[in-house]
């Protein structure tokens, strides 16, 4: 059955997200990549901030969300779009200037804690700043998780497929989740929302603003 998953009305939610992304398109490469990955993969804040270098498979465009960083300790493997893949490559170039070591993917550039993993609090502060700039104070990382899942439902994904993509163990209290392979999810993603995400996320591909 078709379902709507969202904090805002579907139309307003999509408009707000697009407005936010347009503002975020002027941000630094780390911020743009993190937003794109959160949106593509329907990530919770902690899942996003704790992504490690070894969690991404660029050849297949797959992200492994490790169970220990999820709300319900249920890991998953999810695909991401070509645009997000390009942003990933660009961020890796900058990350190497901060650290050549494997480990947390998202590092701080602040002189006080240079090359330290970005914290949930720091990321929330970044998103909050962009939300205020866009005059959309209710936008958060979780907004993009809701939008991603709503769009999967809109284009015909089965509720069990959405549960697997989102890392939900159950649908309400009666429906059990269905295990889908990463290949199944990737094929479904490419045939459905990949083009829609690509259209929206191109605003994050803009060049970094001059210092």
Locations of the language-model features?
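Conserved catalytic core of the tyrosine transesterase superfamily
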Residues: 1-211
């Amino acid at each position: 059955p078709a379902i709507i998953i969202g904090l805002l009305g579907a139309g307003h939610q999509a408009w707000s997200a697009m407005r936010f992304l347009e503002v975020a398109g002027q941000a630094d490469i780390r911020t743009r990549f993190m937003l794109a990955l959160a949106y593509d993969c329907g990530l919770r804040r902690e899942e996003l901030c704790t992504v490690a270098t070894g969690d991404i498979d660029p050849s297949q465009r797959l992200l492994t969300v490790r169970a220990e960083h999820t709300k319900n300790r249920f890991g998953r493997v999810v695909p991401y779009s070509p645009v997000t893949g390009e942003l990933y490559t660009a961020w890796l170039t900058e990350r190497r200037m901060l650290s050549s070591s494997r480990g947390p993917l998202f590092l701080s550039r602040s002189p006080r804690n240079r090359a330290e993993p970005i914290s949930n609090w720091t990321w929330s502060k970044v998103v909050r700043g962009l939300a205020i700039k866009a005059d959309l104070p209710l936008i958060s990382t979780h907004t993009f998780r809701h939008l991603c899942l709503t769009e999967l439902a809109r284009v015909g994904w089965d509720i069990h497929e959405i549960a697997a993509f989102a890392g939900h163990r159950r649908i309400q209290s009666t429906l059990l989740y269905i295990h889908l392979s990463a290949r199944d999810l990737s094929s479904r993603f490419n045939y459905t929302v990949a083009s829609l995400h690509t259209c929206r996320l191109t605003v994050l591909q803009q060049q970094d603003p001059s210092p």
